[in-house]
Protein backbone atom coordinates (compact mmCIF):
# COMPACT_ATOMS: atom_id res chain seq x y z
CA UNK A 1 0.00 0.00 0.00
CA UNK A 2 1.36 3.40 -0.98
CA UNK A 3 1.21 6.24 1.47
CA UNK A 4 -0.28 9.51 0.22
CA UNK A 5 -0.03 12.96 1.68
CA UNK A 6 -2.35 15.93 1.58
CA UNK A 7 -0.07 17.41 -1.09
CA UNK A 8 -0.97 14.55 -3.44
CA UNK A 9 -4.58 15.73 -3.24
CA UNK A 10 -3.79 19.44 -3.49
CA UNK A 11 -1.54 19.26 -6.53
CA UNK A 12 -2.90 17.16 -9.38
CA UNK A 13 -0.55 15.23 -11.61
CA UNK A 14 -0.06 17.09 -14.86
CA UNK A 15 -0.39 15.09 -18.04
CA UNK A 16 1.08 16.60 -21.17
CA UNK A 17 2.01 15.00 -24.44
CA UNK A 18 4.64 17.57 -25.34
CA UNK A 19 6.77 19.75 -23.08
CA UNK A 20 5.36 23.22 -22.41
CA UNK A 21 7.23 25.90 -24.34
CA UNK A 22 7.79 28.43 -21.60
CA UNK A 23 7.94 32.10 -22.59
CA UNK A 24 8.73 34.29 -19.58
CA UNK A 25 8.14 38.02 -19.91
CA UNK A 26 9.72 40.11 -17.15
CA UNK A 27 11.43 36.85 -16.23
CA UNK A 28 13.48 37.98 -13.26
CA UNK A 29 15.16 34.87 -11.87
CA UNK A 30 12.65 32.50 -13.50
CA UNK A 31 9.92 31.88 -10.92
CA UNK A 32 7.59 30.49 -13.59
CA UNK A 33 10.21 27.92 -14.60
CA UNK A 34 10.79 27.04 -10.94
CA UNK A 35 7.05 26.54 -10.40
CA UNK A 36 6.72 24.24 -13.42
CA UNK A 37 9.82 22.30 -12.36
CA UNK A 38 8.51 21.92 -8.80
CA UNK A 39 5.11 20.75 -10.08
CA UNK A 40 6.79 18.17 -12.28
CA UNK A 41 5.51 19.68 -15.53
CA UNK A 42 7.76 18.89 -18.48
CA UNK A 43 8.80 22.15 -20.13
CA UNK A 44 11.49 23.79 -22.20
CA UNK A 45 12.96 27.25 -21.71
CA UNK A 46 11.77 28.64 -25.05
CA UNK A 47 12.15 32.42 -24.75
CA UNK A 48 12.44 35.03 -22.06
CA UNK A 49 12.51 38.78 -21.81
CA UNK A 50 14.55 40.37 -19.03
CA UNK A 51 16.62 43.48 -19.62
CA UNK A 52 18.15 43.76 -16.14
CA UNK A 53 21.55 42.09 -16.42
CA UNK A 54 21.88 41.03 -12.77
CA UNK A 55 18.56 39.17 -13.03
CA UNK A 56 19.67 37.57 -16.30
CA UNK A 57 22.90 36.39 -14.67
CA UNK A 58 20.89 34.89 -11.80
CA UNK A 59 18.46 33.24 -14.23
CA UNK A 60 21.35 31.61 -16.07
CA UNK A 61 23.00 30.46 -12.82
CA UNK A 62 19.73 28.88 -11.64
CA UNK A 63 18.42 27.36 -14.87
CA UNK A 64 21.33 27.01 -17.31
CA UNK A 65 24.33 26.55 -15.03
CA UNK A 66 25.85 23.91 -17.32
CA UNK A 67 25.96 26.20 -20.37
CA UNK A 68 29.52 27.52 -20.42
CA UNK A 69 29.48 28.30 -24.14
CA UNK A 70 31.32 31.46 -25.12
CA UNK A 71 28.82 32.84 -27.62
CA UNK A 72 30.96 35.95 -28.02
CA UNK A 73 34.16 34.09 -28.94
CA UNK A 74 34.01 35.04 -32.63
CA UNK A 75 33.00 38.64 -31.92
CA UNK A 76 35.22 41.67 -31.53
CA UNK A 77 34.80 43.91 -28.48
CA UNK A 78 33.15 46.46 -30.75
CA UNK A 79 30.64 43.87 -32.00
CA UNK A 80 29.71 42.95 -28.42
CA UNK A 81 29.20 46.62 -27.53
CA UNK A 82 26.99 47.12 -30.59
CA UNK A 83 24.95 43.99 -29.83
CA UNK A 84 24.36 44.98 -26.20
CA UNK A 85 23.40 48.50 -27.26
CA UNK A 86 20.87 47.20 -29.80
CA UNK A 87 19.40 44.76 -27.28
CA UNK A 88 18.83 47.57 -24.77
CA UNK A 89 20.37 46.11 -21.61
CA UNK A 90 19.84 47.71 -18.21
CA UNK A 91 21.60 47.48 -14.87
CA UNK A 92 18.89 49.16 -12.81
CA UNK A 93 15.72 47.82 -14.43
CA UNK A 94 14.56 51.38 -15.10
CA UNK A 95 16.37 52.57 -18.21
CA UNK A 96 18.62 51.06 -20.85
CA UNK A 97 22.33 51.73 -20.81
CA UNK A 98 23.51 54.03 -23.58
CA UNK A 99 26.29 52.97 -25.92
CA UNK A 100 28.60 55.39 -24.11
CA UNK A 101 27.78 53.78 -20.76
CA UNK A 102 28.32 50.27 -22.11
CA UNK A 103 31.60 51.39 -23.66
CA UNK A 104 32.79 53.17 -20.49
CA UNK A 105 35.55 51.94 -18.23
CA UNK A 106 32.91 51.17 -15.60
CA UNK A 107 32.17 47.98 -17.52
CA UNK A 108 35.03 45.72 -18.58
CA UNK A 109 35.19 43.71 -21.76
CA UNK A 110 34.84 40.56 -19.63
CA UNK A 111 31.62 41.91 -18.07
CA UNK A 112 30.19 42.81 -21.49
CA UNK A 113 31.01 39.35 -22.85
CA UNK A 114 29.50 37.69 -19.79
CA UNK A 115 26.31 39.70 -20.29
CA UNK A 116 26.18 38.72 -23.95
CA UNK A 117 26.81 35.04 -23.15
CA UNK A 118 24.11 35.07 -20.45
CA UNK A 119 21.63 36.59 -22.91
CA UNK A 120 22.34 33.93 -25.53
CA UNK A 121 22.35 31.02 -23.05
CA UNK A 122 18.95 32.01 -21.66
CA UNK A 123 17.29 32.69 -25.06
CA UNK A 124 16.71 36.22 -23.82
CA UNK A 125 15.04 38.78 -26.09
CA UNK A 126 16.04 41.43 -23.50
CA UNK A 127 14.05 44.68 -23.87
CA UNK A 128 10.35 43.91 -24.27
CA UNK A 129 9.76 47.42 -25.66
CA UNK A 130 11.80 46.61 -28.76
CA UNK A 131 10.11 43.30 -29.59
CA UNK A 132 8.05 43.01 -32.75
CA UNK A 133 5.73 40.24 -33.89
CA UNK A 134 6.75 38.05 -36.75
Regions found by a protein language model. Give the residues of each.
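Conserved active-site and SAM-binding loop architecture
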Residues: 1-134
